């Protein structure tokens, strides 16, 4: 279900402060965040944000196409290890 238009997009306040401070200073270092639910704003474009996947922080470089999406959409939380392989079974049991 989409968020109500009257509420507007959500972004974590601390993340917004960090991005605004970096835009003012011109710094382009990696921003570490746990806020996967934050919406990507146009001011985030060009920054690298390390988003937590439950185990580690995965760096995500934000482009213009990502604006309006959530940070968590670009970092998978589950690791796919493949289906079981057909191993040759020995004849002796």
UniProtKB/Swiss-Prot annotation:
Domain of life according to the entry: Bacteria
Keyword rRNA-binding: yes
Keywords of this entry: Ribonucleoprotein, Ribosomal protein, RNA-binding, rRNA-binding
The UniProt record lists the keyword Ribosomal protein: yes
InterPro entries on file: Ribosomal_uS19, Ribosomal_uS19_bac-type, Ribosomal_uS19_CS, Ribosomal_uS19_SF
Single GO MF descriptor: structural constituent of ribosome
GO biological process terms held by the UniProt record: ribosomal small subunit assembly; translation
One GO location term (cellular component): cytoplasm
Function in brief: Protein S19 forms a complex with S13 that binds strongly to the 16S ribosomal RNA.
NCBIfam families: rpsS_bact
Family that this chain belongs to: Belongs to the universal ribosomal protein uS19 family.
Name assigned to this protein: Small ribosomal subunit protein uS19
């Amino acid at each position: 279900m989409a968020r109500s238009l009257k509420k507007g997009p959500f972004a974590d306040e601390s993340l917004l402060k960090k991005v605004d401070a970096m835009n003012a200073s011109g710094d382009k270092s990696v921003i570490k965040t746990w806020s996967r639910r934050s919406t990507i704003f146009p001011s985030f474009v060009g920054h690298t944000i390390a988003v937590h996947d439950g185990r580690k922080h995965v760096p995500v470089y934000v482009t213009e196409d990502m604006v309006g999406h959530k940070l968590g959409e670009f970092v998978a939380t589950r690791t796919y290890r493949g289906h079981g392989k057909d191993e040759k079974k020995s004849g002796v049991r």
